[in-house]
């Protein structure tokens, strides 16, 4: 079967109890991607679709990223249902960096929460340039237009601060549970004349596929499949991989010929950016590669950094960041502790101009140029050359302390 429609990866972001999973579940139902009988009865029937993992069902929280597909007349979508609880922000980071567009879910009865702000900021830093805002649970505020407008103003102000133009962002009153304005216009919001959620999704611009950039596939998992062998799984970020080509995994160093490529249980001869694939490489075993490795062509291998220069924004740090600080950097699918070697310059966050050379410390709200050294080999690349491989978030003490972009790499070899 040929791949015909263009494909969009969609991240659902927002505060934990604002109804992301329920909205995704109802969207999948309306789009015909799941049957009614797959749903539980009662309050949480739509969320169940996304929360397949047993542990999640017990806790009632979405933990891992659930890749779900649905289609409209225009596009094929893969939903990256991004977890909302604070300790899962790092999942969101690896999730959001895989998304072409974001749906920000804000509950009408609860409004903008601190986490809402953090998710908006991170998604912009991690490369989401298209946004749809779903004002959810509109049924709980009696479909009140004034309440919707109040929230629209509040969220507009928030997204403007990180560089979205509110005029380009659809704001949609929805009820994830009742189904208002998901597929069809709801009679309960006769005051609303804009698109439904599915119409707004079809108005997104398909991402231009970075096919001319070098091949990069960050590995999410490695499986052993009977009759096939070792199957690394990941999303093609850039470039094109064809069956029969030789690829190398860095920093592991393992290489071999691509024997097969599979996506959603179908085999393909090639894989392009945006494709979530499993593939098999001759001579590469399960113990040779792991999550966080990156596959590329042998003649243009992913860069392993000895150290790198970066531009960061400190989002929230209870103290100060100084030389020697060693938090965990989350870049594509890798998580590696990196040490701050030098604080090169503090920047004016409004203009990006240097405000102070070699500052003694950085604190919440500061933007800066820094030099860091990974404590073990990791792939990270200049964000100007390969943006998908140059974005990262910095985590410490169970929270995201900073986010940034790699601007130069000193290669390890």
Curated annotation (Swiss-Prot):
Record InterPro entries: EFTu-like_2, G_TR_CS, GTP-eEF1A_C, P-loop_NTPase, Small_GTP-bd, T_Tr_GTP-bd_dom, TRAFAC_GTPase_members, Transl_B-barrel_sf
Region feature G3, mapped onto this chain: 81-84
EC annotation from Swiss-Prot or TrEMBL: 3.6.5.3
Binding annotation for Mg(2+): 21
Protein name per the record: Elongation factor 1-alpha
UniProt cross-references to Gene3D superfamilies, sorted A to Z: P-loop containing nucleotide triphosphate hydrolases, Translation factors
Gene that encodes it: tuf
SUPFAM superfamilies for this protein: EF-Tu/eEF-1alpha/eIF2-gamma C-terminal domain, P-loop containing nucleoside triphosphate hydrolases, Translation proteins
Species name: Methanobrevibacter smithii (strain ATCC 35061 / DSM 861 / OCM 144 / PS)
tr-type G domain sequence ranges: 5-211
Region feature G4, mapped onto this chain: 136-139
Function: GTP hydrolase that promotes the GTP-dependent binding of aminoacyl-tRNA to the A-site of ribosomes during protein biosynthesis.
Keyword Mitochondrion assigned: no
Region entry G5, spans: 175-177
CDD domains in the cross-refs: EF1_alpha (cd01883), EF1_alpha_II (cd03693), EF1_alpha_III (cd03705)
